[in-house]
Amino acid sequence: MTDMPKTPLLDLVHRPADMKGLSDRQLVQLADELRSETVSAVSVTGGHLGAGLGVVELTVALHAVFDTPRDKIIWDVGHQCYPHKILTERRDRIRTLRMKGGLSGFTKRSESPYDPFGAAHSSTSISAALGFAVARDLGGVVPEGLGDAIAVIGDGSMSAGMAYEAMNNAGHLKKRMIVILNDNEMSIAPPTGAMSSYLSRLYSGEPFQDFKAAAKGAVSLLPEPFREGAKRAKDMLKGMAVGGTLFEELGFSYIGPIDGHDLDQLLPLLRTVKARATGPIMIHALTKKGKGYAPAETARDKGHATAKFDVLTGQQTKAPSNAPSYTKVFAQSLLEEATKDDKICAVTAAMPDGTGLNLFAERFPSRCFDVGIAEQHGVTFSAALAAGGMKPFCAMYSTFLQRGYDQVVHDVAIQRLPVRFAIDRAGLVGADGATHAGSFDIAYLANLPGFVVMAAADEAELKHMVATAVAHDDGPIAFRFPRGEGNGVDMPEVGEVLEIGKGRIITEGTRVAILSFGTRLAEVQKAGEALAARGITPTIADARFAKPLDREMILDLVANHEALITVEEGAIGGFGSHVAQLLSDEGVFDTGFKYRSMVLPDIFIDQSSPADMYAVAGMNAADIETKVLSVLGIAQIGEARA
């Protein structure tokens, strides 16, 4: 068991107000203790370590200078919020991070008044801060009051268009608000795009002219890790038109870059900004992800997301794998197909590792594109690749594909362009909770004309679906698969091209048919075994396709059974709704046929293990068994054999 760190000063700080009497020297000590406590807590729970370590000093400075919760600190994404939670009355629960009934791994309004705006997806903080600033000036009333609005946003999040939309609007409205650019040059993947080469221009404009003089020669005063970033200013100045930085052109007063780990810089700067700011301010702070904890600093992803680990060594404790992950199966299957077909290319939005496309990039760098946190652009870029004769695989998490939905409709579906959507993290994903659940993609894709929508029941099926997507050139096609390990099934050497819109019968039975879409098939089969012990043998089928439906198979199941139950890892309005529409159109319900659809409930399910989340959703084997007994009108074991 890891020893708890000694934190005598932090032990006295239960809320930000307790910091007001501390000297600047004591705040430095507080930051050191806060860093140790963050490392200790995440070693127990796992979670996003590196981001929080990179903003420890910034977190201390913000809470020491501003008056939270009246002043609103909005953490973009929220990965970096663990130190903030420790300082804001939640230290006693910090070792429940991301656990069932515990603290969220992100900011969450329902959890604390110190979390004024929830987050988990990126690039929303500036819009939210502007909204608070406008609400303040219009006389809005909230229990904690409305003071300053401060957005803390990383350089990775600055690759998303929404951040610039917000800055453009903020510059126009000229409201007093503060944006702190947390520039660590290391989001999850290396930062992408021209913006990453722009961020270090040493300049600051009105009303902070005194900072200009201090900025001269500041590069030489920065610690070595920060010098290189600051030197990028020289390259940018060569091609710049007269008129200040991009941020100033958008209407912000710009200060920076400063050392985001030096409280001797942060504290006086924030105090000056608080006292003198009149309009929107941009503070550019250079930080280091994983700062102060060597295993995180030296990790390739700077400790972005970790399992539980040993504090002394940084060694993570992960359970041994019994089967390859779905993500790895997808990536390897795509690599095999790309070896045979040079038209295959891959697109991801700042998630090369998470989607497995880092493997593709190593093998085929000229055919792999990380577009940054820019799902809208990524989808349209993929559409034009398809229009140009390529075979693009647009690999995104289900929850993030939502951000590019208009492009899916307007640029892909309406034009019937053969973009292949590889939808990872489908269904309930566990510790990241509701913000990362892949609950809605079946519904929002299967309602689009001409869209083919598949779901893999196991890892072998996923391999077949990759091959099917490669071969499909008649419009868009999507296949979804969950987070985590596969079922350990035998893997085919080569993926088989599936017939579009055709499912498969797994086991033949009588009375009731269970039609599964996706990886709940394993739970359906467990339910089938339990039902067999009761004398009930259901027919079990794997739909494979939510669109187009296998009309022939479904209507045959109806013709030969008393009841049909569909099961899917998606929200209301998805696969089951399409089956119900088919049955309605065919007049099946006119005969009194019994139909039930098992879907995710109409709630956002809080974090837990995926198994616990599916238990809450009523989607496990026992729930399926109960549904079968209910639809057949069987309440007791003895009735089943009657």
UniProtKB/Swiss-Prot annotation:
Alphabetically, which GO biological process terms does the record hold?
A: 1-deoxy-D-xylulose 5-phosphate biosynthetic process; glyceraldehyde-3-phosphate metabolic process; terpenoid biosynthetic process; thiamine biosynthetic process
> Which cofactor(s) does the record list?
Mg(2+); thiamine diphosphate
Q: Which residues are listed for Mg(2+) binding in this entry?
A: D155, N184
Q: Which residues bind thiamine diphosphate?
A: H79, A120, H121, S122, G156, S157, N184, Y293, E375
Keywords in alphabetical order: Isoprene biosynthesis, Magnesium, Metal-binding, Thiamine biosynthesis, Thiamine pyrophosphate, Transferase
Give the pathway annotation.
Metabolic intermediate biosynthesis; 1-deoxy-D-xylulose 5-phosphate biosynthesis; 1-deoxy-D-xylulose 5-phosphate from D-glyceraldehyde 3-phosphate and pyruvate: step 1/1
Reading the lineage from the top rank, the first entry is Bacteria
Which reaction is this enzyme known to catalyze? D-glyceraldehyde 3-phosphate + pyruvate + H(+) = 1-deoxy-D-xylulose 5-phosphate + CO2
CC cofactor note? Binds 1 Mg(2+) ion per subunit.
InterPro entries registered for this protein in UniProt: Dxylulose-5-P_synthase, THDP-binding, Transketo_C/PFOR_II, Transketolase-like_Pyr-bd, Transketolase_BS, Transketolase_C, Transketolase_CS
E.C. code: 2.2.1.7
Query: What are the recorded GO MF terms, alphabetically?
Result: 1-deoxy-D-xylulose-5-phosphate synthase activity; magnesium ion binding; thiamine pyrophosphate binding
Q: Which SUPFAM superfamilies match?
A: Thiamin diphosphate-binding fold (THDP-binding), TK C-terminal domain-like
Q: What single Pfam family name could you report for this chain, choosing any that match?
A: Transketolase_C
Q: How does it assemble?
A: Homodimer.
Record function comment = Catalyzes the acyloin condensation reaction between C atoms 2 and 3 of pyruvate and glyceraldehyde 3-phosphate to yield 1-deoxy-D-xylulose-5-phosphate (DXP).
Q: Which family does it belong to?
A: Belongs to the transketolase family. DXPS subfamily.
By what name is this protein known? 1-deoxy-D-xylulose-5-phosphate synthase 2
